Amino acid sequence: MQRYFIELTKQQIEEAPTFSITGEEVHHIVNVMRMNEGDQIICCSQDGFEAKCELQSVSKDKVSCLVIEWTNENRELPIKVYIASGLPKGDKLEWIIQKGTELGAHAFIPFQAARSVVKLDDKKAKKKRERWTKIAKEAAEQSYRNEVPRVMDVHSFQQLLQRMQDFDKCVVAYEESSKQGEISAFSAIVSSLPKGSSLLIVFGPEGGLTEAEVERLTEQDGVTCGLGPRILRTETAPLYALSAISYQTELLRGDQ
């Protein structure tokens, strides 16, 4: 069944007998899927609830829906994982956002690292963020997520440091930790986090984080960790981390 994310909370949807879908979703429902009155879709509210809905009326700029039933499906990771990626070259961040969304990331924080080759001014950063947000939304629909991960504004390194106290735990993926055999810290941290906790994981761009950046991150209570015995690419490391978290918190621990 086709899935759509709508900009209403569950409470707002329940306040009236029917609710309306507008914007780009209408084009997809009407012109791409060619749906009509009586067809059913899945709607996901802004606050992560999903409902089976029936189309009551269809026009070129608005679709009215009736909730048939709310479901209890929860496809979000038990912990909220924030992926902070030092801006990589090319379209690598698009790949990280698309696949990271499929693997359950809660949000993405692109930041300007010392070794980032890419330099974005405000205009380019805004345009990029719009594209990244669209990629996250499409990936969330495809993977049947309850929520669309938020793609935040491009941060400076200083802005990233200032945000670190917002999270329950912060991990710094550092290749020197892998080289030194420190591969158990990441698993221990994930195991210690209760359901609903927030975890920030910081990844460097190509070439990794500098020693100075790592030092400043650890001064803000970031914990350096290796991600296995092998050195991973900047676009591979976040996906490895998310897969490991999914295994440990969903398959192994069985949290729902």
UniProtKB/Swiss-Prot annotation:
GO biological process, one term: rRNA base methylation
GO CC terms, sorted: cytoplasm
TM helices/strands, residue ranges: none
InterPro entries assigned to the protein according to its UniProt record, in alphabetical order: Alpha/beta_knot_MTases, PUA-like_sf, RsmE, RsmE_MTase_dom, RsmE_PUA-like, tRNA_m1G_MTases_N
Keyword tRNA-binding appears in the UniProt entry: no
Alphabetical keyword list: Cytoplasm, Methyltransferase, rRNA processing, S-adenosyl-L-methionine, Transferase
Entry's Gene Ontology molecular function annotations: rRNA (uridine-N3-)-methyltransferase activity
Record field: catalytic activity: uridine(1498) in 16S rRNA + S-adenosyl-L-methionine = N(3)-methyluridine(1498) in 16S rRNA + S-adenosyl-L-homocysteine + H(+)
Pfam families membership: Methyltrans_RNA (PF04452), PUA_4 (PF20260)
SUPFAM superfamilies in alphabetical order: alpha/beta knot, PUA domain-like
Enzyme class: transferase
Compartment annotation: Cytoplasm
Major place of residence: cytoplasm
EC code: 2.1.1.193
Described purpose of this protein according to its UniProt entry: Specifically methylates the N3 position of the uracil ring of uridine 1498 (m3U1498) in 16S rRNA. Acts on the fully assembled 30S ribosomal subunit.
Matching NCBIfam families: PRK11713.1-4, PRK11713.1-5, RsmE family RNA methyltransferase
UniProt xrefs under PANTHER family: 16S RRNA (URACIL(1498)-N(3))-METHYLTRANSFERASE, RIBOSOMAL RNA SMALL SUBUNIT METHYLTRANSFERASE E
Assigned protein family: Belongs to the RNA methyltransferase RsmE family.
Protein name: Ribosomal RNA small subunit methyltransferase E
Organism: Bacillus subtilis (strain 168)
Underlying gene: rsmE
